[in-house]
Protein backbone atom coordinates (compact mmCIF):
# COMPACT_ATOMS: atom_id res chain seq x y z
CA UNK A 1 0.00 0.00 0.00
CA UNK A 2 1.09 3.56 -0.67
CA UNK A 3 1.51 5.98 2.21
CA UNK A 4 -1.62 7.84 1.04
CA UNK A 5 -3.59 4.59 1.20
CA UNK A 6 -2.30 3.85 4.71
CA UNK A 7 -3.14 7.36 5.92
CA UNK A 8 -6.60 7.21 4.34
CA UNK A 9 -7.30 3.89 6.03
CA UNK A 10 -6.30 5.34 9.40
CA UNK A 11 -8.23 8.56 8.79
CA UNK A 12 -11.48 6.73 8.06
CA UNK A 13 -11.40 5.25 11.56
CA UNK A 14 -11.12 8.70 13.13
CA UNK A 15 -12.67 11.27 10.77
CA UNK A 16 -16.05 10.83 9.01
CA UNK A 17 -15.18 9.61 5.52
CA UNK A 18 -11.51 10.13 6.32
CA UNK A 19 -11.63 13.83 5.41
CA UNK A 20 -12.63 17.19 6.87
CA UNK A 21 -14.46 18.35 3.73
CA UNK A 22 -16.35 15.82 1.57
CA UNK A 23 -14.93 16.57 -1.89
CA UNK A 24 -11.43 15.67 -0.68
CA UNK A 25 -12.48 12.02 -0.30
CA UNK A 26 -12.52 11.49 -4.11
CA UNK A 27 -16.18 10.46 -3.79
CA UNK A 28 -16.86 12.05 -7.16
CA UNK A 29 -14.13 10.11 -8.98
CA UNK A 30 -13.42 7.03 -6.86
CA UNK A 31 -10.10 5.80 -5.55
CA UNK A 32 -7.83 6.96 -2.75
CA UNK A 33 -7.36 10.70 -2.15
CA UNK A 34 -3.89 12.15 -2.26
CA UNK A 35 -2.36 13.10 1.08
CA UNK A 36 -0.17 16.14 0.53
CA UNK A 37 3.26 16.63 2.07
CA UNK A 38 4.01 20.12 0.75
CA UNK A 39 3.31 22.56 -2.06
CA UNK A 40 5.29 25.23 -3.86
CA UNK A 41 4.41 27.44 -6.80
CA UNK A 42 2.17 25.53 -9.22
CA UNK A 43 3.04 22.13 -7.75
CA UNK A 44 1.73 19.76 -5.09
CA UNK A 45 3.91 17.00 -3.63
CA UNK A 46 2.18 14.00 -2.08
CA UNK A 47 3.39 11.88 0.83
CA UNK A 48 4.62 9.25 -1.64
CA UNK A 49 6.98 11.73 -3.27
CA UNK A 50 5.08 12.38 -6.51
CA UNK A 51 4.73 15.91 -7.93
CA UNK A 52 1.60 17.25 -9.63
CA UNK A 53 0.78 20.37 -11.61
CA UNK A 54 -2.04 21.72 -9.44
CA UNK A 55 -5.26 23.17 -10.85
CA UNK A 56 -7.18 23.00 -7.58
CA UNK A 57 -5.18 25.66 -5.75
CA UNK A 58 -6.68 24.77 -2.37
CA UNK A 59 -10.07 25.31 -4.06
CA UNK A 60 -9.27 28.84 -5.15
CA UNK A 61 -7.17 30.80 -2.64
CA UNK A 62 -3.78 30.11 -4.24
CA UNK A 63 -4.03 32.63 -7.07
CA UNK A 64 -0.34 33.53 -6.54
CA UNK A 65 0.70 29.88 -6.29
CA UNK A 66 1.58 27.88 -3.20
CA UNK A 67 3.95 29.06 -0.48
CA UNK A 68 4.30 32.60 -1.81
CA UNK A 69 7.16 34.28 0.08
CA UNK A 70 5.31 37.55 0.75
CA UNK A 71 2.41 35.72 2.41
CA UNK A 72 4.63 33.25 4.25
CA UNK A 73 6.79 36.04 5.66
CA UNK A 74 3.74 38.08 6.69
CA UNK A 75 2.37 35.10 8.63
CA UNK A 76 5.69 34.47 10.37
CA UNK A 77 6.08 38.13 11.35
CA UNK A 78 2.52 38.34 12.66
CA UNK A 79 2.86 35.09 14.63
CA UNK A 80 5.89 36.47 16.42
CA UNK A 81 3.66 39.20 17.90
CA UNK A 82 0.95 36.78 19.06
CA UNK A 83 -1.68 34.52 17.56
CA UNK A 84 -5.00 36.01 18.65
CA UNK A 85 -6.03 38.82 20.95
CA UNK A 86 -9.84 38.99 20.88
CA UNK A 87 -9.47 42.75 20.51
CA UNK A 88 -9.16 45.16 17.57
CA UNK A 89 -5.82 45.53 15.77
CA UNK A 90 -4.35 48.00 13.31
CA UNK A 91 -4.17 45.29 10.65
CA UNK A 92 -7.96 44.92 10.70
CA UNK A 93 -8.27 48.60 9.81
CA UNK A 94 -5.63 48.34 7.08
CA UNK A 95 -7.31 45.25 5.66
CA UNK A 96 -10.72 46.95 5.62
CA UNK A 97 -9.22 50.00 3.90
CA UNK A 98 -7.61 47.82 1.25
CA UNK A 99 -10.70 45.71 0.56
CA UNK A 100 -13.00 48.72 0.24
CA UNK A 101 -10.49 50.42 -2.07
CA UNK A 102 -10.24 47.36 -4.31
CA UNK A 103 -14.00 46.66 -4.38
CA UNK A 104 -15.70 50.07 -4.72
CA UNK A 105 -19.24 48.76 -4.08
CA UNK A 106 -18.21 47.87 -0.52
CA UNK A 107 -18.58 51.00 1.60
CA UNK A 108 -18.00 48.93 4.74
CA UNK A 109 -16.78 45.39 5.40
CA UNK A 110 -17.05 42.87 8.25
CA UNK A 111 -14.41 40.13 8.53
CA UNK A 112 -15.40 36.55 9.34
CA UNK A 113 -13.65 33.17 9.16
CA UNK A 114 -15.10 31.47 6.08
CA UNK A 115 -17.20 31.91 2.99
CA UNK A 116 -20.07 30.11 4.71
CA UNK A 117 -20.00 32.65 7.55
CA UNK A 118 -19.97 35.47 5.01
CA UNK A 119 -23.00 34.28 3.04
CA UNK A 120 -24.93 33.22 6.14
CA UNK A 121 -24.35 36.61 7.76
CA UNK A 122 -25.12 38.59 4.59
CA UNK A 123 -28.47 36.81 4.23
CA UNK A 124 -29.34 37.45 7.89
CA UNK A 125 -28.45 41.10 7.36
CA UNK A 126 -30.58 41.31 4.20
CA UNK A 127 -33.52 39.78 6.04
CA UNK A 128 -33.09 42.13 8.98
CA UNK A 129 -32.71 45.20 6.77
CA UNK A 130 -35.73 44.45 4.57
CA UNK A 131 -37.95 42.83 7.19
CA UNK A 132 -38.59 39.97 4.77
CA UNK A 133 -37.93 36.23 5.12
CA UNK A 134 -37.65 34.61 1.70
CA UNK A 135 -34.50 34.43 -0.40
CA UNK A 136 -33.77 33.43 -3.99
CA UNK A 137 -30.83 31.22 -4.88
CA UNK A 138 -30.07 29.25 -8.02
CA UNK A 139 -30.15 25.55 -8.76
CA UNK A 140 -26.65 24.06 -8.62
CA UNK A 141 -25.12 27.11 -6.92
CA UNK A 142 -23.38 26.59 -3.59
CA UNK A 143 -23.00 29.33 -1.00
CA UNK A 144 -21.66 27.33 1.93
CA UNK A 145 -23.37 24.90 4.24
CA UNK A 146 -25.79 27.14 6.17
CA UNK A 147 -29.18 25.44 6.51
CA UNK A 148 -31.10 27.89 4.34
CA UNK A 149 -28.60 27.44 1.50
CA UNK A 150 -28.49 23.63 1.28
CA UNK A 151 -31.44 23.58 -1.08
CA UNK A 152 -30.69 22.34 -4.61
CA UNK A 153 -27.07 23.18 -3.85
CA UNK A 154 -23.94 22.57 -5.90
CA UNK A 155 -20.35 21.57 -5.01
CA UNK A 156 -20.03 18.50 -2.78
CA UNK A 157 -23.80 18.31 -2.40
CA UNK A 158 -24.03 17.47 -6.11
CA UNK A 159 -21.13 15.03 -5.86
CA UNK A 160 -22.93 13.15 -3.09
CA UNK A 161 -26.21 13.26 -4.98
CA UNK A 162 -27.84 15.14 -2.11
CA UNK A 163 -28.48 18.72 -3.25
CA UNK A 164 -31.07 18.92 -0.47
CA UNK A 165 -29.24 17.88 2.70
CA UNK A 166 -30.87 15.77 5.41
CA UNK A 167 -30.89 17.71 8.66
CA UNK A 168 -32.33 20.88 7.13
CA UNK A 169 -35.86 21.36 8.52
CA UNK A 170 -38.61 21.95 5.99
CA UNK A 171 -39.51 25.11 7.90
CA UNK A 172 -36.07 26.53 7.02
CA UNK A 173 -36.09 25.35 3.42
CA UNK A 174 -39.55 26.77 2.67
CA UNK A 175 -38.12 30.30 2.72
CA UNK A 176 -35.52 29.45 0.05
CA UNK A 177 -36.82 29.83 -3.50
CA UNK A 178 -34.70 28.13 -6.14
CA UNK A 179 -34.56 29.51 -9.66
CA UNK A 180 -32.69 28.45 -12.81
CA UNK A 181 -29.27 30.01 -13.37
CA UNK A 182 -29.18 32.21 -16.49
CA UNK A 183 -33.00 32.21 -16.67
CA UNK A 184 -34.48 35.60 -15.74
CA UNK A 185 -38.02 34.42 -16.40
CA UNK A 186 -37.80 31.98 -13.49
CA UNK A 187 -36.66 34.81 -11.21
CA UNK A 188 -39.46 37.12 -12.27
CA UNK A 189 -41.95 34.33 -11.66
CA UNK A 190 -40.68 33.96 -8.08
CA UNK A 191 -40.96 37.70 -7.43
CA UNK A 192 -44.45 37.84 -8.89
CA UNK A 193 -45.54 34.97 -6.64
CA UNK A 194 -44.04 36.61 -3.51
CA UNK A 195 -43.76 40.33 -4.38
CA UNK A 196 -43.49 41.58 -0.77
CA UNK A 197 -41.71 38.64 0.85
CA UNK A 198 -38.31 38.26 -0.85
CA UNK A 199 -35.42 39.81 1.07
CA UNK A 200 -32.64 39.12 -1.40
CA UNK A 201 -31.18 37.24 -4.31
CA UNK A 202 -27.85 35.52 -3.66
CA UNK A 203 -25.92 34.52 -6.76
CA UNK A 204 -22.52 33.33 -7.86
CA UNK A 205 -21.58 35.75 -10.67
CA UNK A 206 -19.79 32.80 -12.25
CA UNK A 207 -21.31 29.55 -11.04
CA UNK A 208 -18.24 27.69 -9.80
CA UNK A 209 -19.89 24.92 -7.84
CA UNK A 210 -21.51 23.11 -10.75
CA UNK A 211 -18.13 23.22 -12.45
CA UNK A 212 -17.71 26.61 -14.20
CA UNK A 213 -20.77 28.25 -15.75
CA UNK A 214 -20.46 31.94 -16.71
CA UNK A 215 -23.50 34.23 -16.78
CA UNK A 216 -25.22 35.10 -20.03
CA UNK A 217 -24.76 38.82 -20.84
CA UNK A 218 -28.25 39.83 -19.72
CA UNK A 219 -28.41 37.70 -16.56
CA UNK A 220 -26.67 39.73 -13.83
CA UNK A 221 -27.99 43.14 -15.01
CA UNK A 222 -31.43 41.54 -15.14
CA UNK A 223 -31.14 40.40 -11.52
CA UNK A 224 -30.17 43.93 -10.51
CA UNK A 225 -33.22 45.34 -12.27
CA UNK A 226 -35.58 42.80 -10.67
CA UNK A 227 -34.21 43.54 -7.19
CA UNK A 228 -34.77 47.25 -7.77
CA UNK A 229 -38.28 46.64 -9.07
CA UNK A 230 -39.36 44.49 -6.10
CA UNK A 231 -37.36 46.13 -3.28
CA UNK A 232 -34.99 43.22 -2.63
CA UNK A 233 -31.23 43.29 -2.08
CA UNK A 234 -28.77 41.74 -4.52
CA UNK A 235 -26.01 39.72 -2.84
CA UNK A 236 -23.15 38.69 -5.10
CA UNK A 237 -21.19 35.74 -3.74
CA UNK A 238 -17.62 36.44 -4.84
CA UNK A 239 -16.04 33.84 -2.56
CA UNK A 240 -14.61 32.14 -5.67
CA UNK A 241 -14.52 34.99 -8.16
CA UNK A 242 -13.36 37.83 -5.93
CA UNK A 243 -9.89 39.12 -6.91
CA UNK A 244 -9.66 36.25 -9.43
CA UNK A 245 -11.94 37.05 -12.36
CA UNK A 246 -10.86 40.69 -12.05
CA UNK A 247 -9.24 42.76 -9.32
CA UNK A 248 -12.60 44.23 -8.28
CA UNK A 249 -14.27 40.87 -8.82
CA UNK A 250 -16.76 39.47 -11.29
CA UNK A 251 -19.12 42.33 -10.45
CA UNK A 252 -16.63 44.67 -12.11
CA UNK A 253 -15.94 42.26 -14.98
CA UNK A 254 -19.66 41.98 -15.76
CA UNK A 255 -20.55 45.57 -14.76
CA UNK A 256 -23.19 44.91 -12.11
CA UNK A 257 -23.57 46.72 -8.77
CA UNK A 258 -24.64 44.58 -5.79
CA UNK A 259 -25.99 45.77 -2.47
CA UNK A 260 -23.83 43.26 -0.59
CA UNK A 261 -20.75 41.26 -1.58
CA UNK A 262 -19.40 38.09 0.02
CA UNK A 263 -15.69 37.29 -0.14
CA UNK A 264 -13.49 34.36 0.84
CA UNK A 265 -10.61 32.21 -0.39
CA UNK A 266 -8.15 34.72 -1.97
CA UNK A 267 -8.92 37.33 0.69
CA UNK A 268 -7.12 35.09 3.22
CA UNK A 269 -4.15 34.13 1.08
CA UNK A 270 -4.52 30.54 2.29
CA UNK A 271 -5.66 31.33 5.82
CA UNK A 272 -9.32 30.92 6.90
CA UNK A 273 -10.87 34.31 6.10
CA UNK A 274 -14.23 35.44 4.79
CA UNK A 275 -15.84 38.86 4.58
CA UNK A 276 -19.08 40.53 3.64
CA UNK A 277 -19.82 44.17 2.99
CA UNK A 278 -21.60 46.68 0.84
CA UNK A 279 -23.86 49.69 1.12
CA UNK A 280 -23.26 51.77 4.23
CA UNK A 281 -26.95 52.03 5.14
CA UNK A 282 -27.29 48.25 4.99
CA UNK A 283 -24.08 47.55 6.90
CA UNK A 284 -25.10 50.04 9.60
CA UNK A 285 -27.91 47.62 10.50
CA UNK A 286 -25.25 45.18 11.76
CA UNK A 287 -24.40 44.92 15.47
CA UNK A 288 -23.11 46.80 17.40
CA UNK A 289 -24.47 49.83 15.49
CA UNK A 290 -27.67 48.06 14.46
CA UNK A 291 -29.99 45.26 15.59
CA UNK A 292 -28.79 42.42 13.31
CA UNK A 293 -26.43 40.25 15.34
CA UNK A 294 -23.21 38.69 14.06
CA UNK A 295 -20.02 37.84 15.93
CA UNK A 296 -16.94 35.62 15.88
CA UNK A 297 -14.17 34.81 18.38
CA UNK A 298 -11.46 34.62 15.73
CA UNK A 299 -12.91 37.07 13.19
CA UNK A 300 -10.22 39.47 12.02
CA UNK A 301 -7.49 37.54 13.83
CA UNK A 302 -4.02 39.03 13.27
CA UNK A 303 -2.46 36.04 11.48
CA UNK A 304 -5.25 35.79 8.92
CA UNK A 305 -5.37 39.55 8.39
CA UNK A 306 -1.62 39.68 7.79
CA UNK A 307 -1.84 36.87 5.24
CA UNK A 308 -4.78 38.46 3.46
CA UNK A 309 -3.22 41.91 3.40
CA UNK A 310 -0.01 40.54 1.88
CA UNK A 311 -1.94 38.48 -0.67
CA UNK A 312 -4.19 41.31 -1.83
CA UNK A 313 -1.27 43.69 -2.21
CA UNK A 314 0.41 41.17 -4.51
CA UNK A 315 -2.80 40.46 -6.43
CA UNK A 316 -3.26 44.20 -7.01
CA UNK A 317 0.04 44.46 -8.90
CA UNK A 318 -0.21 45.31 -12.63
CA UNK A 319 -0.40 42.40 -15.04
CA UNK A 320 -1.63 39.75 -12.60
CA UNK A 321 -5.09 39.30 -14.11
CA UNK A 322 -3.85 39.59 -17.67
CA UNK A 323 -1.45 36.73 -16.93
CA UNK A 324 -4.22 34.63 -15.37
CA UNK A 325 -6.43 35.17 -18.39
CA UNK A 326 -3.63 34.39 -20.86
CA UNK A 327 -2.71 31.14 -19.13
CA UNK A 328 -6.31 29.99 -18.70
CA UNK A 329 -7.21 30.82 -22.30
CA UNK A 330 -4.20 28.86 -23.58
CA UNK A 331 -5.16 25.86 -21.43
CA UNK A 332 -8.79 25.96 -22.59
CA UNK A 333 -7.88 26.27 -26.26
CA UNK A 334 -5.26 23.52 -26.00
CA UNK A 335 -7.66 21.10 -24.32
CA UNK A 336 -10.30 21.73 -26.97
CA UNK A 337 -7.79 21.18 -29.78
CA UNK A 338 -6.53 17.95 -28.21
CA UNK A 339 -10.07 16.65 -27.68
CA UNK A 340 -11.06 17.47 -31.25
CA UNK A 341 -8.03 15.59 -32.58
CA UNK A 342 -9.19 12.52 -30.63
CA UNK A 343 -12.83 12.90 -31.65
CA UNK A 344 -13.98 13.51 -28.08
CA UNK A 345 -16.84 16.01 -27.59
CA UNK A 346 -15.75 18.62 -25.06
CA UNK A 347 -16.80 22.04 -23.78
CA UNK A 348 -14.35 24.16 -21.79
CA UNK A 349 -15.78 27.24 -20.08
CA UNK A 350 -13.38 29.83 -18.68
CA UNK A 351 -13.46 33.31 -17.16
CA UNK A 352 -10.32 34.98 -15.86
CA UNK A 353 -8.47 32.42 -13.74
CA UNK A 354 -11.36 29.90 -13.58
CA UNK A 355 -12.19 27.08 -15.97
CA UNK A 356 -14.47 24.07 -16.30
CA UNK A 357 -14.17 20.88 -18.36
CA UNK A 358 -17.38 19.20 -19.59
CA UNK A 359 -17.64 15.98 -21.57
CA UNK A 360 -20.77 16.70 -23.59
CA UNK A 361 -22.15 16.74 -27.12
CA UNK A 362 -23.85 20.06 -26.39
CA UNK A 363 -22.49 23.23 -27.95
CA UNK A 364 -22.55 25.09 -24.63
CA UNK A 365 -23.11 24.59 -20.90
CA UNK A 366 -25.10 27.43 -19.34
CA UNK A 367 -27.18 25.98 -16.49
CA UNK A 368 -27.62 23.14 -14.00
CA UNK A 369 -29.55 20.98 -16.46
CA UNK A 370 -26.71 21.25 -18.99
CA UNK A 371 -24.17 20.26 -16.34
CA UNK A 372 -26.18 17.25 -15.22
CA UNK A 373 -26.40 16.02 -18.83
CA UNK A 374 -22.60 15.75 -19.11
CA UNK A 375 -20.72 12.43 -19.10
CA UNK A 376 -19.57 12.09 -15.48
CA UNK A 377 -18.18 8.58 -15.98
CA UNK A 378 -15.88 9.79 -18.74
CA UNK A 379 -14.73 12.62 -16.48
CA UNK A 380 -13.84 10.11 -13.76
CA UNK A 381 -11.61 8.18 -16.16
CA UNK A 382 -10.09 11.42 -17.45
CA UNK A 383 -9.34 12.59 -13.91
CA UNK A 384 -7.46 9.44 -12.93
CA UNK A 385 -5.54 9.22 -16.20
CA UNK A 386 -4.47 12.86 -15.84
CA UNK A 387 -3.48 12.17 -12.24
CA UNK A 388 -1.24 9.36 -13.50
CA UNK A 389 0.29 11.94 -15.85
CA UNK A 390 1.09 14.21 -12.91
CA UNK A 391 -1.79 16.67 -13.36
CA UNK A 392 -4.11 17.31 -10.40
CA UNK A 393 -7.57 18.50 -11.42
CA UNK A 394 -10.59 18.97 -9.16
CA UNK A 395 -11.71 15.44 -8.14
CA UNK A 396 -15.31 16.08 -9.15
CA UNK A 397 -17.14 16.83 -12.38
CA UNK A 398 -18.98 19.57 -10.47
CA UNK A 399 -16.04 21.72 -9.35
CA UNK A 400 -14.24 24.50 -11.21
CA UNK A 401 -10.52 24.50 -11.89
CA UNK A 402 -8.24 27.33 -10.82
CA UNK A 403 -5.18 28.87 -12.44
CA UNK A 404 -2.38 30.70 -10.64
CA UNK A 405 0.23 33.16 -11.83
CA UNK A 406 2.84 30.65 -10.63
CA UNK A 407 1.90 28.36 -13.54
CA UNK A 408 4.30 28.74 -16.44
CA UNK A 409 3.45 28.39 -20.10
CA UNK A 410 5.57 25.24 -19.98
CA UNK A 411 3.25 23.87 -17.26
CA UNK A 412 0.25 24.65 -19.46
CA UNK A 413 1.78 23.02 -22.54
CA UNK A 414 2.78 19.96 -20.50
CA UNK A 415 -0.82 19.71 -19.27
CA UNK A 416 -2.16 19.91 -22.82
CA UNK A 417 0.33 17.25 -23.97
CA UNK A 418 -0.78 15.01 -21.10
CA UNK A 419 -4.43 15.53 -22.06
CA UNK A 420 -3.61 14.66 -25.66
CA UNK A 421 -2.17 11.33 -24.53
CA UNK A 422 -5.15 10.70 -22.27
CA UNK A 423 -7.74 11.60 -24.91
CA UNK A 424 -6.11 9.12 -27.29
CA UNK A 425 -6.84 6.35 -24.77
CA UNK A 426 -10.14 7.67 -23.43
UniProtKB/Swiss-Prot annotation:
Its main location: cytoplasm. It is an enzyme of class 5 (isomerase). It comes from the Bacteria. GO terms for molecular function: glutamate-1-semialdehyde 2,1-aminomutase activity; pyridoxal phosphate binding; transaminase activity. GO terms for cellular component: cytoplasm. Pathway: Porphyrin-containing compound metabolism; protoporphyrin-IX biosynthesis; 5-aminolevulinate from L-glutamyl-tRNA(Glu): step 2/2. The modification N6-(pyridoxal phosphate)lysine is found at residue 265. NCBIfam families: hemL (TIGR00713), PRK00062.1 (NF000818). This is Glutamate-1-semialdehyde 2,1-aminomutase. It comes from Shigella flexneri. The gene is hemL.
Amino acid sequence: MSKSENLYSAARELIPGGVNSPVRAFTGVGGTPLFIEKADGAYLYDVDGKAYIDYVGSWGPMVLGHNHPAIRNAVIEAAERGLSFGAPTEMEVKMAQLVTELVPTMDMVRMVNSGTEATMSAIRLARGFTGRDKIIKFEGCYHGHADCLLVKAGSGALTLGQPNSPGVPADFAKHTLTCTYNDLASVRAAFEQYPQEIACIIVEPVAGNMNCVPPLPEFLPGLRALCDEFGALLIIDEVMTGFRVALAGAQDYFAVVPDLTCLGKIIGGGMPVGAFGGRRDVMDALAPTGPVYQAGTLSGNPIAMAAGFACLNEVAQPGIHETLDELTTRLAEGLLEAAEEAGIPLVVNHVGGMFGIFFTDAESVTCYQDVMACDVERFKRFFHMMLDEGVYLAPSAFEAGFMSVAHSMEDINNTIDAARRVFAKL
